[in-house]
Amino acid sequence: MPLVDPVTMSTTLIKSGPAQQQPAPKAAVPAIPLVNSPLALPASIAHSVLLAGLFYWRFDALVADPVTSLQTGLPVVAAIQAVYLMLSLPPAGSSLSSKKPRPGEKKSSDGREAKSFPTAVISLLLALILTPALHILLVLFGAPFLTHVPHTFLCCAHIALLAIYPVFYVRGSDPVPLQAVVGVSAPFDQTFGGFLGTVVGAWLGSVPIPLDWDREWQKWPVTIVVGAYLGYIVGSQLLGTVFYGRRWEVTPEMKEE
């Protein structure tokens, strides 16, 4: 009976055994393109122009009476956002494909038209539900706690319409893409660009408040709202078009040996 080398035998058994399963990589969160519609791009541009025009027109009223101006402007901004989302972006759960049908091929329907309106309504409600949480967050970052409560709450409602409403519309309640958006690891598109622009703009808008310029527009929360709107318009259009599909580059930390 021939001798069997135990080392060779163990090596053979390891090679012939089932391959060790590697952990599956996390699915990449895709960028959200505009829908394949002739109205998508014009509606996207028009919505930014309308927001900028509305804000410019109401700026003096915002400075004179922030609460009334923010309150009356809230339903108008919500309507502009809702129409833009339904015309330009796919609702959560619909196909992300922007492929045009070939000549003679019948365009397939993914139910986008049927999902757009209910998704827009539900996403709006979710965004407004998070307004108290944004209020608490702003207070933690230095907003007035016992005074200017309606000012802060209405400011947070506008931020929710700009930053959170579009994200819920295209991402839904799936925690994976939502974590990517909050963690700044999602690819740039109009919704993530608007989210990032609103947050950065509102943060930069807080810079002039403590300065001793004694200007009327420095009062709370005028500069915060100005920064949020400017950041949203620039972020959604610039990051959503010029840098579409790219990701925020984060330098990995050096691992300890």
Curated annotation (Swiss-Prot):
GO terms for biological process: GPI anchor biosynthetic process. Coiled coil: none annotated. Disulfide bonds: none annotated. Pathway: Glycolipid biosynthesis; glycosylphosphatidylinositol-anchor biosynthesis. The chain crosses the membrane at residues 37-57, 73-93, 121-141, 149-169, 191-211, 224-244. InterPro entries: GPI_biosynthesis_protein_Pig-F. GO terms for cellular component: endoplasmic reticulum membrane. It is a multi-pass membrane protein. Pfam families: PIG-F (PF06699). It is found in: Endoplasmic reticulum membrane. Keywords: Endoplasmic reticulum, GPI-anchor biosynthesis, Membrane, Transmembrane, Transmembrane helix. Its main location: endoplasmic reticulum. Belongs to the PIGF family. Acts in the GPI biosynthetic pathway between GlcNAc-PI synthesis and GPI transfer to protein. This is Glycosylphosphatidylinositol anchor biosynthesis protein 11.
